[in-house]
C-alpha cells in the first residue's frame, strides 16, 4: 500500500499514483477494478486526493496555532463551490498526473469528473464570490476559515416542463461528499425561543438568563480548501442541525411514531434547505433560525479556538477578524455581545469596543427586498435575549446620534436599528453598519452609490468607516480549469505567471497585432464552441451552428437583470427577419440559463416566455438558420464552466444602479467574450481597464434613471416606435402561446401600466442599436478577435487574489504571501 501522505508531487510517478488510486479503491470503496462503477473510481480518486491534502491541512492548522496568527473568519449563508476534484488537483499541481494514471487504468478522466455533484450551497453571485475568495485566501496563505451551513438540499434542481420552471430537490449529498470530514467533537448548543430572567446574583452582578428554550445542536463538517502552488490548506466549516434528544421512545411506546420523528425533523429542518420560501411566516421564521444557527455555532467556535491558546479575552480583537458576507450573518454582532457580556461577563463597553473592531460588513445590494428587516414580533419570539441586546446597542447608538444632531428626530429615525411604524422591524443592514469597523461595497460605482443613497446618513456620521473592494474571480477555476485550450495558448505565449498574478495578462495585448496568434485565438474559441454545441445537444436536443454568434445571458432570473429586455429584442429581430428574409445578417444563437426564485412569479413567467419564443423561432424554417433561441435548464457552476469558454457575446444588461458588481461579466471577458452592457456595477471599471471602445455600452445612466423616474411614461415609447409596439402586441395577442392567449398579458401590463420599473422599454431602442454594432463587428473576424484579445488582456485587475489583498491590507490587517513566497 502506498503511503500517499508522504509523497512529494515532484517525485510522484504515474505508476505510484495509479497504485495509490487502486489502494483507495480496494480499501476505502471496497471494490475491484473489474466490478467498479465510474462513481466508485471517482470516489477512489477523491479519497486519494484527500490523503494528499491531509498532510498540508494538518501542517497549516498546526502552524496557525504555533505562530498564534490573527485569523480571518468569513461568514456566509452561501458557498457555491461547484465541483472540487479538478480544482483540488489543479491547486495541488497533480492534474495531469492523475489524468495519465487514470488513462493507464482505462478510465476517462473527463467522464469521471461528471460523476461529482455540484456543491450548490448558494443561490448566485454571493455564494460563488465566497467560493472564489476561499480559493484566493488559501493561495495567498491568509489564515482564514469559511463558515456556512451544510444544507441537505442546496439550491433546487430546475426542470423545464412545457416551458415552465419546476423545482426539484438538489440531492447533492445522495452519494455522500468525499471532501468533508465530520468533526463530531465540535458540537455546539444553539438556543431559540424561551424567556429572559433578569436578577442579581450572589456577587451583586446583574444577570440575564435565558430559560425554557428550544435547543438545537450544531455539528461541524470540514472541507479542505487548498491554495494554488503552496502547502496552505484552509478550512470551510459547515454546520448541520441535530436534535439534542434523538428518538423519543416515550412517544413511540405509546403508539405515536409520527410525533417521535416529527420533533426531530422540525429541529433538523434548520439545515435542510437553502433559503426557504420567506413569503410566508413559517418560511421567515425558518430563515431567521438559519441565520442565528450559523452565527451562534460560529461565534462559539471562534471563542473556543481563541481560548485554546489564550487565558483571557483581552486580546481577542487582535487575533480575530470577522467578515460578514451581506446582512445574513449580521446577527453575529448581537451574538458576540451575548457571549462576551452574558457568558464571559465582560463589561458592556469593553465588549462593544472589541466587537466593533472584530466585525466588518460587505454590502452586496441596494435592492429594498434584499435588505433584511425582521418583524419585531418574530424576532422577539425567536431570539428574546438578542432583541434586548439590539435594543441596548440601538439606545446607546442613538445617544451618540442625539449628541451630534440634537433635537433632530428625522436623523434618529433614519439611523435607528429599530424601525418604528405600523409594524416595527429590526434593520439588519443598520445593525451591520453600526457594529462593524469597516463597511465595503463591491465595485467603485456601488460603493459610491451606498454612500450617496442607502447609507448616506451613516456615511456623513463616520465617513472613515466606508471603503471599496471591487469583486474579483479566481483565475484558477475561471481560466486555467474551465478553459484549458486558452490556458495552454497563454502559457506558450506569456508563461503561466498570470494564474497567480492576473496582471500578467496585459502581456498578450501586443500579440493582438500578430495574425498567427489571432488565428490560434480564433481556433481556441471555435473548438470551445464546438464542445458547447455538443453539450447543448445533449442537454436540450437542439443542433446549433458553432460558426454562429454565441450570445449568452446566464445568471439568476430577475427583472433588474433584464432577461425580459433580451427576449423582447429577440422577438423584434424575429419580426424583422420574417419581413426581410433575404437580409444579410449574422447567424446568432441566443443562450439563456438561470433559475428564478420559487416564489418570484414574474421571473418564472419570463422563463416561460423565453421558452415559448424559442419554440416558435426554432421551428420557423424562414429564420432558424439565422436565429436560434435556447434555454439551458438547471444553471450551476459546472454548466457555467462549459458555457463561458464558448461564448462570443456576454450580456450584462442590468438596470443602471441596480447591479452592485457582478462577477459573470468578469468571467466572460477573462475568456475572451465581448461585453454588451450598461454602465452599471463592475462594467464601469471593466470599461476603464479594457477600454470603453472595446465593449458595447448602451442605455441610460443611473443619474438619468433617477431623473426619468419622476416623469417616465413607457407608453410614449410604443407610440413613437411601431416595431416595439408590434413586439408587445404579439405578447398581448397570445402569438407565442396559442393555448392561453392571456398568459403573457401580465408582462405587458408590467411594462405599460405598472410604470416599467426596471426601464426595459426605456433602454430597448439603445439596446437594439448596440446589437447592430455587435453584428457589424462580428462580420469582421480579425477585428472581433483583436478586441477579444484586448478584453482578456485588460482583466488583470479583476482577480479575487487582488480583492483579497485589498481586504487583507485595508480591512483585516493580516499579511498575505504570494505563491513565489513574496509577502506584503
Curated annotation (Swiss-Prot):
Q: Does the keyword Nucleus apply?
A: no
Instruction: Provide this UniProt record's keywords sorted from A to Z.
Output: Allosteric enzyme, Carbohydrate metabolism, Glycogen metabolism, Glycosyltransferase, Pyridoxal phosphate, Transferase
Where is the secretion signal located?
A: none
Q: Does the keyword Transferase apply?
A: yes
Its recorded name reads: Glycogen phosphorylase
Listed GO biological process terms? glycogen catabolic process
Example GO CC term: the record gives: cytoplasm
* Reaction(s) catalysed by this chain's protein: [(1->4)-alpha-D-glucosyl](n) + phosphate = [(1->4)-alpha-D-glucosyl](n-1) + alpha-D-glucose 1-phosphate
Q: Which organism is it from?
A: Chlamydia pneumoniae (Chlamydophila pneumoniae)
Q: What InterPro entries has UniProt attached to this entry? A: Glycg_phsphrylas (IPR011833), Glyco_trans_35 (IPR000811), Pyridoxal_P_attach_site (IPR035090)
What family is this protein classified in? Belongs to the glycogen phosphorylase family.
Give the N6-(pyridoxal phosphate)lysine positions (modified residues).
667
The task this protein performs is described as: Phosphorylase is an important allosteric enzyme in carbohydrate metabolism. Enzymes from different sources differ in their regulatory mechanisms and in their natural substrates. However, all known phosphorylases share catalytic and structural properties.
A single MF term (Gene Ontology): pyridoxal phosphate binding
This protein's superkingdom?
Bacteria
EC number(s) per UniProt? 2.4.1.1
Disulfide-bonded cysteine pairs: these are none
Task: List cofactor names only.
Answer: pyridoxal 5'-phosphate
